[in-house]
Swiss-Prot record:
Entry domain remark: The Ala/Pro-rich domain may contain discrete activation and repression subdomains and also can mediate protein-protein interactions.
Signal peptide annotation: none
Biased composition annotated in UniProt, kind: Pro residues: 97-106
Protein name: Krueppel-like factor 13
One cellular component (GO) term of this entry: nucleus
GO MF annotation: an example: zinc ion binding
Function per UniProt: Transcription factor that activates expression from GC-rich minimal promoter regions, including genes in the cells of the erythroid lineage. Represses transcription by binding to the BTE site, a GC-rich DNA element, in competition with the activator SP1. It also represses transcription by interacting with the corepressor Sin3A and HDAC1. Activates RANTES and CCL5 expression in T-cells.
Cell compartment(s), UniProt: Nucleus
Tissue specificity annotation: Ubiquitous.
Keyword set, alphabetical order: Activator, DNA-binding, Metal-binding, Nucleus, Phosphoprotein, Repeat, Repressor, Transcription, Transcription regulation, Zinc, Zinc-finger
GO BP of this protein: negative regulation of cell population proliferation; negative regulation of erythrocyte differentiation; regulation of transcription by RNA polymerase II; transcription by RNA polymerase II
Modification after translation: Phosphorylated by PRP4K; phosphorylation regulates its transcriptional modulator activity.
Keyword Acetylation part of the UniProt annotation: no
Length: 288
């Protein structure tokens, strides 16, 4: 408001100063020093100068009048004090909502209902029917590989401690547990040194603790090479030798060995297995 009043006052002063024209007097000279021809020639030019000044003054007055009209059309912004007063007035007009009073218990059964606090008017709205609240994804549903590995490790440890694996080694310092008694029996031979599987090849007196070890050894006598490379068709006696060889090829993929599995692949899993599980006894006489 003060700025607008100052601008109006300044514009009014400009109008007053422009309306009162200053009279310009020429230099005073004696009548003797000025020739008559010069005085006569100067008199016609005075009205032209006055006309130019009148035109300039009227143009400037018109510009100032337009400025004043524009200022009057613009509404002044309210002061901060007026804004606070208006906000306080609006706040005083709006009624304050108070929560309803708690009903007084009239019977012993109503005391439990009265113990619950009343729901205020500003409580959060309940979710609509058919809409479930968002749930944070657990570690099992996350897509991070690190979390998946942790979950798998936790599951494997839980499987080891599960009651299904009840066949435990009774030797001191050995905490291995197996799900089948045959697996435990094969493991106990590592402690006792028992080797019930003997080679029946002529002049070969080797014995083994597991039947798969005997079958692997027997192929050294027969020369059987049933594990063939899927790329170069080389053959090997043991599946682990085939795997090492196949990895040297540039176009090798682990799925190649799995596709060519068949019956021979399933029977050769014990060749490179590190488990203590015992496989069915293979009679050397049945092999070619």
């Amino acid at each position: 408001m003060a700025a607008a009043a100052y601008v109006d006052h300044f514009a009014a002063e400009c109008l007053v100063s422009m309306s009162s024209r200053a009279v310009v007097h020429g230099p005073r000279e004696g009548p003797e020093s000025r020739p008559e021809g010069a005085a006569v020639a100067a008199t016609p030019t005075l009205p032209r100068v006055e006309e130019r000044r009148d035109g300039k003054d009227s143009a400037s007055l018109f510009v100032v009048a337009r400025i004043l009209a524009d200022l009057n059309q613009q509404a002044p912004a309210p002061a901060p004090a007026e804004r606070r007063e208006g906000a306080a007035a609006r706040k005083a007009r709006t009624p304050c909502r108070l929560p309803p009073p708690a009903p007084e218990p009239t019977s012993p059964g109503a005391e439990g209902a009265a113990a619950a606090p009343p729901s205020p008017a500003w409580s959060e709205p309940e979710p609509e029917a058919g809409l479930e609240p968002e749930r944070e994804p657990g570690p099992a549903g996350s897509g991070e590989p690190g979390l998946r590995q942790r979950v798998r490790r936790g599951r494997s440890r839980a499987d080891l401690e599960s009651p299904q694996r009840k066949h435990k080694c009774h030797y001191a310092g050995c905490e291995k547990v197996y799900g089948k008694s045959s697996h435990l029996k094969a493991h106990l031979r590592t402690h006792t040194g028992e080797r019930p599987f003997a080679c029946s090849w002529q002049d070969c007196n080797k014995k083994f603790a597991r039947s798969d070890e005997l079958a692997r050894h027997y192929r050294t006598h027969t020369g059987e090479k049933k594990f063939s490379c899927p790329i170069c068709e080389k053959r090997f006696m043991r599946s682990d030798h085939l795997t090492k060889h196949a990895r040297r090829h540039a176009n090798f993929h682990p799925g190649m060995l799995q596709r060519r599995g068949g019956g021979s692949r399933t029977g050769s899993l014990s060749d490179y297995s590190r488990s203590d599980a015992s496989s069915p006894t293979i009679s050397p006489a049945s092999s070619p």
